[in-house]
Amino acid sequence: MAGQNARLNVVPTVTMLGVMKARLVGATRGHALLKKKSDALTVQFRALLKKIVTAKESMGDMMKTSSFALTEVKYVAGDNVKHVVLENVKEATLKVRSRTENIAGVKLPKFDHFSEGETKNDLTGLARGGQQVRACRVAYVKAIEVLVELASLQTSFLTLDEAIKTTNRRVNALENVVKPKLENTISYIKGELDELEREDFFRLKKIQGYKRREVERQAANAKEFAEEMVLEDISMQRGISINAARNFLVGGAEKDSDIIF
């Protein structure tokens, strides 16, 4: 399990936050698809296992039957029948070809048997044991068919087993490493952006307070300047000092406040 502090080394920006969210969405979708693929491969894996068990049981019976048939041929036609059969065979009539089958994106090798050409040993053992020779041939053909099927199943089984292990490793990596790391990175970026937002808000409040105080100071200076100008006008008009003009102005303001409307 990835640690709580495991994250990607990124610059905490809004753009990077969008990139990390997109990567998390992609990782989540990939995890879901790989999980479905693993489940599908597991189902196929179990089905192959059942077929292999059945094929092995059938192979045992077939090999037993073919061995008994060969023993019967040797008893009836003699040990020489093997050389007679080999002399009449120039090329194999039962052959095997390979192909691939795609299951959930995994290519599984398959083997198929087929007959090609004519059998040249139909008259083998005509003097004695001909019926037993044909029965032995049929028994061994069936045994070969079962062996080919078993080889195909076991090869597909091993390939599928490796594919399931690889898929499960990817699922675990996405679930326990990639997704937690992306989630931690997103949480880190959000925390840093929130901190930057708080700092910007505090800085803005300080600037607003400074501007407000500056406006108040300028207003006070303007008011003081206006009062000075009024006092100078009164002083010049009445020929009195600035202090006398200030007292005159204050006294006039007090008389105005006593007037009752």
From Swiss-Prot:
Predominant place of localization: membrane
Any one GO MF annotation of this record: proton-transporting ATPase activity, rotational mechanism
Family: Belongs to the V-ATPase D subunit family.
Chain's role: Subunit of the peripheral V1 complex of vacuolar ATPase. V-ATPase is responsible for acidifying a variety of intracellular compartments in eukaryotic cells, thus providing most of the energy required for transport processes in the vacuolar system.
One cellular component (GO) term of this entry: plasma membrane
InterPro entries associated with the record: V_ATPase_D
Membrane topology recorded in Swiss-Prot or TrEMBL: Peripheral membrane protein
Protein name, as recorded: V-type proton ATPase subunit D
Residues carrying Phosphoserine: S241
Compartment(s) of residence: Vacuole membrane
Disulfide bridge map: none
Domain of life: Eukaryota
Subunit (UniProt): V-ATPase is a heteromultimeric enzyme composed of a peripheral catalytic V1 complex (components A to H) attached to an integral membrane V0 proton pore complex (components: a, c, c'', d and e).
Keywords: Hydrogen ion transport, Ion transport, Membrane, Phosphoprotein, Transport, Vacuole
